[in-house]
């Protein structure tokens, strides 16, 4: 059935195909529709935040959008993916919110990881003391150190230079083979351990440098050229961190090909959706740990809005999902350029990402 609905806003009648009948609704530009209302705020982001905080979603619908420019003049069209989709969810109850996912992708492609690896990453390195040496250069380019033990006893009597990857002890450790254990910071969660997470959120950190548990990590720094660094300050001011029940894939004993548990984690100010959030069910991430913490975003229900271009209005391009592929140690799921569900190695270079954020 195909019928029209209408809505009067400040004397202007807006006509659109019903959002509930045939699910065909192209969305409207909120800056135009609510121009008179927005005039009372410093910017459109303060307006939408006030609306959300008040729980006032009148006249605002899934697939409506706000267009904005990055600090380097790229256009992004942020579409409403869901209104209160996760309200009351979580270990920390989620309040009123809107999750936005860009209609098209960030204009630059980016790998999920520099190597085909989809596990969490917590680097560890063994060193051998000689009783006189105090400074050791690590093979791992650790962004930070979580703990150090000497002969099984924890110590904090050291400094660490992240730029040279050098740990310097106050006193020379006793002689012994592999008697010093240095454990870096990291995450058991594939998304939080990924290069793409750091790139999206303009962070500095270490990522997998190889495909085995013993492969040294490498340091990357996106603080000046990651996506978050390009967002306007007015938008940054209203974005909140998305928290979710993320799948974990990590074991100290070896590389895993499936998720082995889950946990409540902050996904970042900028994130990408899971396979469930796009398709509504598991396909290549068909694992209970991946499926139990998510629901499908309404914007993707019964349509092909998951087909996205590279850059604003660009040609159809594949894009990453947060879900690691089931049965693989190397792959992450992605949305194919034609809209199909598929997966590929984490170092695949022809995959992009949308700009996704939450305002509450």
What feature does the model see in each segment?
Residues 1-14:
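Short, intrinsically disordered N-terminal pre-domain segments
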Residues 8-9, 84-94, 128-132, 159-164, ...:
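Short, ordered beta-strand-loop transition motifs
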Residues 9, 26, 141-142:
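Glycine- and acidic residue-enriched flexible segments with recurrent GG/GxG motifs
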Residues 9, 70-72, 150:
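Structural motif
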Residues 14, 99-100, 136-138, 165-171, ...:
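Generic recognition of long tandem-repeat/solenoid scaffolds
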Residues 17-122, 184-360:
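Collagenous Gly-X-Y triple-helix signature in extracellular proteins
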Residues 120-184:
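Extended beta-strand solenoid/passenger and fiber regions
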